[in-house]
């Protein structure tokens, strides 16, 4: 089947893992406590704090305890949805203030633009919140790349290493899974996408291969047919 849509991961694929771990995560860890204290009474933040209490099993946690739980989750690199949402809010403020610029590899920028011009639909699937995804591409070093994408998916669609998540995403996109190409640097994610019927391509930017999947080192090496 002809590829009609491309679904891409972010970390290690379109963007450097170091940007997320060396820039975004430390920025959120530094600014999240004060952000939560300042905005705890606002509905959007209050809803996420309620989710923190529910997920941690600490129904009576006050704001300071909730902050401590969030910082612990950051230290554990836990993919908790309320943490991702609050990190996204902190990053949004940082992008608005000009303190952050999203990193996207130049080869990815060029390929994404070319694919869009050819009429391919582009989508993102990342463990980072949809809000955070939009910020990385919308406030990137290459400018606003947001208009290139037709949609974004995060952990609300399911874990990235489970095939059901990819079947769900294919349904949301409205195409047979076989007409969607998934790009990632993680074998288990590629396996899950393949099990759901998607075409897969691995990104190994430092060289090497991703077992069981065609692998390239750069978006410049990707041929979409």
Curated annotation (Swiss-Prot):
The reaction(s) annotated as catalysed by this protein in its Swiss-Prot or TrEMBL entry are: 5-methylsulfanyl-2,3-dioxopentyl phosphate + H2O = 1,2-dihydroxy-5-(methylsulfanyl)pent-1-en-3-one + phosphate
Instruction: Identify the pathway.
Output: Amino-acid biosynthesis; L-methionine biosynthesis via salvage pathway; L-methionine from S-methyl-5-thio-alpha-D-ribose 1-phosphate: step 3/6; Amino-acid biosynthesis; L-methionine biosynthesis via salvage pathway; L-methionine from S-methyl-5-thio-alpha-D-ribose 1-phosphate: step 4/6
Enzyme class name: hydrolase
What biological-process GO terms show up in the record?
L-methionine salvage from methylthioadenosine
Cofactor annotation:
Mg(2+)
Which molecular function terms from Gene Ontology are attached? 2,3-diketo-5-methylthiopentyl-1-phosphate enolase activity; 2-hydroxy-3-keto-5-methylthiopentenyl-1-phosphate phosphatase activity; acireductone synthase activity; magnesium ion binding
| UniProtKB keywords | Amino-acid biosynthesis, Hydrolase, Magnesium, Metal-binding, Methionine biosynthesis
Classification via SUPFAM superfamilies = HAD-like
Q: Which Gene3D superfamilies match?
A: 1.10.720.60, HAD superfamily/HAD-like
Enzyme Commission number(s) of this protein? 3.1.3.77
User: What does the record's cofactor remark say about binding?
Assistant: Binds 1 Mg(2+) ion per subunit.
| Regions annotated as coiled coil | none
The record ties this protein, via InterPro entries, to: Enolase-ppase_E1, HAD-like_sf, HAD-SF_hydro_IA, HAD_sf
Family to which the UniProt record says this protein belongs = Belongs to the HAD-like hydrolase superfamily. MasA/MtnC family.
State whether it acts alone or in a complex, and with which partners, per the record: Monomer.
This molecule's function is given as: Bifunctional enzyme that catalyzes the enolization of 2,3-diketo-5-methylthiopentyl-1-phosphate (DK-MTP-1-P) into the intermediate 2-hydroxy-3-keto-5-methylthiopentenyl-1-phosphate (HK-MTPenyl-1-P), which is then dephosphorylated to form the acireductone 1,2-dihydroxy-3-keto-5-methylthiopentene (DHK-MTPene).
Protein name, entry field:
Enolase-phosphatase E1
Q: Which organism is it from?
A: Pseudomonas aeruginosa (strain UCBPP-PA14)
